[in-house]
């Protein structure tokens, strides 16, 4: 068909997702192929896969491990209930099949931007700390500083780009990676990163310090002392060393956030038990707790969730919790 943007491989034209996505806007049936693939994946992995895990009482029980991930996050297997899609609407609909028992509702409590809050605390950067203390939209605040624009005049595009930089910095993103994510040139992406570090001057010092710590000690640690060995930093392979630097920057932040959510889980569980409530903690998905809540206990559970999650760590910025209630997991998210 000689489609524009088509990519050829040794065996013929590529049908990889990224290639098809570039063609979809100009060729309608390509969009249909992508949608079909998405639906087939959802059916085989989630609809059919989860159906095989339903037990006699109608519940699905997963196994949770504390020692599998290098960052300290809890992982879920058989089945994995932490990877139910959230970024695509069709995938999110899978959550509609999860509902509480009669007389109960779901309460979903999710830490808001916890890794950025941990980063602000650990780096001690006053500009980032003040933005959180003042309750500002952190992405709009970053856009204002990076693009030298008054806070109230920041455009949605500027905010979206600043959001990508905010979260990218946590993962040690490169100019190449940011340029690919935002669809901009590498030079422009590097300027975004440079301006970010000018806006938050202590951030670069902190992140560079983590890399140096990793190189000198062969490891980095979380705020609570969790150790992450980084043998990649002493590799003879340049790409491996770069990967190691990203690990050094991210692990103390992501690992500290993982430690905090575990502390919150213990606090919430103990409080539910102490107050003799019938509501119970069902699931943890990284920064999110799902509680099967007795209807009569709803307000009490919401209050204790907010209190215990916010008090789980004493940071220089507040821990904020977004909370939603629903008759299905989908409605509560």
Positions of predicted regions on the chain:
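Conserved catalytic core of nucleic-acid polymerases
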Residues: 25, 61-62, 66-69, 144-277, ...
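Short active-site loop/helix that positions an aromatic residue
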Residues: 113-124
